[in-house]
């Protein structure tokens, strides 16, 4: 698979087969992914790769919060959007509507919507998760937050997601996976000096589930670009 095909066929996977990904495969993907560029080659990332009993332990740590609906304990390490510009809201709502329609979740069915949110928090029962962390002292600076490690980690994440199909794997860059970072931190003994940025769900896609057939739309180039100095 060449890079054009990898980019053009990439999609978010939300249903996985139970088969774990071999460690050797994950190591090869991550080794290649670290060729991502970063500010002055700072490489401000750390991988935490989880599967098997430890991943199940993280899910169990989330259960009390889910059962008691302790939303106040859902405090990700990074600030979440408080509101969206109108255009972003439309895009977000369009995707959500598509997912719910494919999964047969009616607009007024709050119970099913809650169950879907729980599935998100539990990482859709994926066999492996790659957590991406960055150094807290590099993110928080005297004059405010330094956004560049987030940008750099984004380049790294894209590499992982584009490499995965070469091995028959699918991925989802999941914010839900890190909505309760303390649960992850406590189970895996991640120090407070490491901020948990994102969780990449990685596994073998279950293409029998129609949710994996969703291909979200993109605005045409002429709508999102301005050109100067060209004929």
Where do the protein language model's features map onto the residues?
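Acidic, surface-exposed loops and disordered segments
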Residues: 1-231
